[in-house]
Structures are given as structure tokens and as C-alpha cells.
Amino acid sequence: MKEKLIYSRTCVYNINYHVVWSVKYRRKILSAEIEIYLKELVQKIASDKGFTVHLFEVGEGDHIHCFVSAPPKLSVTDIVKYLKGITGRKLFEKYPAIRQKLWKGQLWNHSYYVETIGSVSEENIRRYIEHQSKSY
């Protein structure tokens, strides 16, 4: 686990998320060409905003899976806002034809799924915390 730790000036952390979001109306518009562009764009966004995208894949042409690590100063809602907002705007600029397959000028569904990814199980954390008071 120590090799996964990230050291900053004020803290040590290992914060990882699995984020999933979909195209509005689940339209299958994410072609192989768009996927290549998206992967490059997402890496640039992550670099500019201060987080890391370890893995990014398009599923079935209509949704995204993303494995992200971030410092504690970045909330997952901010990360999703950056990823969905910037990619949506840039995709419409580069591929204006996809706008015709969607209504109201929105590429992504409003909602998203997120879960934390850790190297220690919930059970181990509970056991560790419960045993803290017993060590005195």
C-alpha cells in the first residue's frame, strides 16, 4: 500500500474514484474516432486541473468509465464537472454533427455514478478503529 501513497506538503493520501456517466438519452454516438479524441482530452483536463486519470474507456458507444486519483482539495463533484463540462463543449465544437442526435444542446446525462476505490477493505478499517481504544 505504501507505494500508492501520494505525499503533499500538508498530507499523505490515496484517493481513487470509479466514475461512470452516459450520453444523454443513451445515444450511441461515441465512435472509435471520438473515443481517441476523448482519451487525449481527458488526460489534458486532468493535467490542467490537478488530478490523474489512470484508465478511461467508452462503453458500448454511449457511456464512459473513468478511474481517477485526486488530491483531497478536489471534490469528486468538481472532477466530474470538469470532465463532463469541458468534454461536452469540446466534442460539440469538433464534431457538430453529434448535436443533431441530441436535444437541448446537452451531450451528457445530468447524473453520474461514483464509487471510491481503496486498497483496504471496510472490514479492516472497522477492525482497526475498534481496536484503537483497546491499545491503552
Model-derived features with residue positions:
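Basic nucleic-acid-binding interfaces
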Residues: 1-136
